[in-house]
Amino acid sequence: MRASTYHLNTLKEAPAEAEVASHRLMTRAGMIRKLAGGIYTYMPLGLKVIRKIEAIVRAEMDAAGAIELLMPVVQPAELWQESGRWEQYGAELLRIKDRHQRDFVLQPTSEEVITDIARNEIHSYRQLPLNFYHIQTKFRDERRPRFGLMRGREFTMKDAYSFDRDEAGAQQSYDKMYDAYMRIFERLGLQFRAVAADTGSIGGSRSHEFQVIADTGEDLLVYNPDSQYAANIELAEAPALLAERAAATQPLEAVPTPGAAKCADVAKLLGLPLERTLKSIVLATEPEPGKVQVWLLLLRGDHELNEIKAGKLPGLAGFRFATEDEIVAHFGCKPGYLGPIGTALPVRVVADRTVANMADFVCGANREDFHYQGANWGRDLPEPELVADLRNVVEGDPAPDGAGRLAIQRGIEVGHVFFLGTKYSEALKATFLDETGKPALLQMGCYGIGITRIAGAAIEQNHDERGIIWPRAIAPFEVVICPVGWGKNETVRNESVKLYDALRARGVDVILDDRDARPGVMFAEWELIGVPLRVTVGERGLNDGVVELQARRESTAAKIPAGSALEQVLAKLETL
């Protein structure tokens, strides 16, 4: 490819709305252009990156025995109603009507469609196992699309779905896809971590996320540097306390805490460590229509509530945060001074493990500008109704596998594998005949990769103040040749074209910048775009028999013999 016949349109400034590096740099590099909120056109450079990602994913899916098909973007509401997700999925599911007033959705995922295919296509155990996949456009009506390709409304995903006769076979399919994902992300050239994760709205009994490591990631990844343990913070279990609760040493006392509505303020005012305070979080459920049950969840003041864990407790599925009116009615006080002692109306109390082990703690007195000091379980209030793991783990907690201490880093989710079991086959009655001729439910797994999101995540992990630094495997071009004096020096032109042709003949994805731009402008543009390797061909260097070779990640260029430039470029590429 020659730059003079390619579409390159870089920008000096990023859009004001761009909050993260990938959004800024992809826009400035001319890779994407915004059409509407969360909806982008992939310009030629951006599309090249997407196609390279797709090619790697497709190759590994094929190698793992998955079979490609293509399911529609528009899906009938009946399938979603049959699975129960028409009501469950929420506002992110874009519902539309056709001219006959029939309901459809723009697919955010394809479990319903693939299960419908399976129940019509798979009849016998002899057809199993099977694994279908497709790479298709998705749409999720995000409330606040942001971060460019990181959280768009329209995007491209690879979805795979496995079908097996029993759980053992389904586990083998899951493991095979897990291994394929490991190979995919290794080939993409990204630093990543596979972590155990919650199954969320997809459902199922087991799942792993594949997270690209990046400081801007929205997810917190918990891992043990001394073992293989790794989990999303949503799933990471906090350690059970083995030590016995200390004996009470203080009397219960109501102390004034004017204006101290947060645990940190109370601790500072009373001159106590934050971990001596109690944090009160009020939730509500509706076990019956029109009947509200209020819950008080108690955490240590320095800990944060894990909503995923809370939602899995008996009676708390589908909880919401209580309204201020509900809080005042049950506690006789506005938020900021709430506690478990002397509530106005009965509430169900759930204590985190650490809280159940506390003595002489500080909690709200259910009276504005007052807290209790020296509170103790069993003496000043009943033992908690339920003790559970409610909190997010913190750095330095003992690892659940007992092999060390936990560390935490940020990540961007780009892939997810789920062991579904019979969740969808049961809902949609997808069965096959086993060896005895009896119908049995298909065992399923589903496996997603965010194709377009990978592009954004790769940039979040690989960029500097000058622009993008693409991993070689997904760079729009592997090599750019930058002639200095293209329009003035025939030798420069000839040597540049010679190297260009030689690299193309060896299968290298190379672009020749034949636009005769000034060197500084040319170099800055290609650094912004992020091509991994640049070869500079200039009159002065050729007079000395050399050209310059510089990797995008390196700060200085190396002079290499012009006569062996091809071999040196190929050798350098192998190191990237």
Curated annotation (Swiss-Prot):
Give the domain of life.
Bacteria
Where does the record say this protein resides? Cytoplasm
Keyword annotations for this protein, in alphabetical order, are: Aminoacyl-tRNA synthetase, ATP-binding, Cytoplasm, Ligase, Nucleotide-binding, Protein biosynthesis
Recorded GO molecular functions are: aminoacyl-tRNA deacylase activity; ATP binding; proline-tRNA ligase activity
Query: Has keyword tRNA processing?
Result: no
Annotated signal sequence is none
Q: Which PROSITE patterns does the protein's record reference? A: AA_TRNA_LIGASE_II
Read off the InterPro entries from this record.
Answer: aa-tRNA-synt_IIb, aa-tRNA-synth_II, aa-tRNA-synth_II/BPL/LPL, Anticodon-bd, Anticodon-bd_dom_sf, Pro-tRNA-ligase_IIa, Pro-tRNA-synth_IIa_bac-type, Pro-tRNA-Synthase_IIa_type1
Could you say which EC number(s) this protein's record lists?
6.1.1.15
Instruction: Please list the GO biological process terms of this entry.
Output: prolyl-tRNA aminoacylation
Q: What is its main location?
A: cytoplasm
A single GO CC term for this protein reads:
cytosol
Q: Which SUPFAM superfamilies match?
A: Class II aaRS ABD-related (SSF52954), Class II aaRS and biotin synthetases (SSF55681), YbaK/ProRS associated domain (SSF55826)
The keyword Aminoacyl-tRNA synthetase is assigned to this record? yes
- Catalysed reaction per UniProt? tRNA(Pro) + L-proline + ATP = L-prolyl-tRNA(Pro) + AMP + diphosphate
Stated family: Belongs to the class-II aminoacyl-tRNA synthetase family. ProS type 1 subfamily.
The subunit structure is: Homodimer.
The domain comment in this protein's record states: Consists of three domains: the N-terminal catalytic domain, the editing domain and the C-terminal anticodon-binding domain.
Q: What role does it play?
A: Catalyzes the attachment of proline to tRNA(Pro) in a two-step reaction: proline is first activated by ATP to form Pro-AMP and then transferred to the acceptor end of tRNA(Pro). As ProRS can inadvertently accommodate and process non-cognate amino acids such as alanine and cysteine, to avoid such errors it has two additional distinct editing activities against alanine. One activity is designated as 'pretransfer' editing and involves the tRNA(Pro)-independent hydrolysis of activated Ala-AMP.
Per its record, how is this protein called by name?
Answer: Proline--tRNA ligase
- This protein's species is Bordetella petrii (strain ATCC BAA-461 / DSM 12804 / CCUG 43448)
